[in-house]
Amino acid sequence: MANKGPRKHLKRLPAPKNWQISRKTNKYTTRPSAGPHAMGSSLPLLLVLRDLLGYADNAREAKKVIKMGKVLVDGVKRKDHRYPTGLMDVISLPDANESFLVVLDEKGRIKLNKIKDNTKKLCKIENKTVIKGGHIQLNLHDGRNQIVKLADATKAEEDIYKTGDCVILSIPEQSIVGHVQFGEGKLAYITGGKHVGDFAKIIGIEKKQLYPDIITLETENGEQFKTIRDYVFIVGDDKPVISM
């Protein structure tokens, strides 16, 4: 049987729950193309412009604006209206002199926060591998791979990056300009579970072997709760290191 290629259509009703779109106005919606974020954790650029920002009345208008290169994601012009945007992406509209950060609301749905500083972004280290020459490749949450060259690959102390840490990338250069370690006392942004969208400080880490680590956190008003490590996104010490 011949390969039909990737699907190009998506019905509105079974679309990801974190999409803030009307489910019954039309049968189909825009399906995100393959990219840095999975479909379940991203939103196509067309829907960002039309449904979230309201800067276009219909799909035709949104496509026109995008194809003209008037929308930047992490400082790069994206002309594909199906390009998937996801957590911590910085979306800029130079003509309107506006920038937005992709975050999550209290129901885990994708939303945009208006920001003033669009020159850097945070990326979570999901995994890391050793490449030729003993250097380190960081696999980040938004699909990118960042190479860290070590002066002396035989010295383990030169590798300061750990899984769960976050790196600060410059925009649009996409180079590492900072590092926030995972650990107690750090400020975290919660990306899943009952406290999704909240900020809280890590006050305890319970290591597990066969299951995800359990992290105990405390909000600004003193409420304590627990969640798994996968839902913890480090954003700084006492306050976020980027505009949120």
From Swiss-Prot:
Domain of life: Archaea
An individual GO BP term: translation
Annotated region (Disordered), positions in chain: 1-36
Compositional bias ranges of the Basic residues kind: 1-14
Any one of the GO CC terms: cytosolic small ribosomal subunit
Keyword terms, alphabetized: Ribonucleoprotein, Ribosomal protein, RNA-binding, rRNA-binding
A GO term, aspect molecular function: rRNA binding
Domain S4 RNA-binding: 43-106
Polar residues composition-biased segments: 19-32
Family of this protein: Belongs to the eukaryotic ribosomal protein eS4 family.
Protein name as catalogued: Small ribosomal subunit protein eS4
Organism in which the protein naturally occurs: Methanococcus aeolicus (strain ATCC BAA-1280 / DSM 17508 / OCM 812 / Nankai-3)
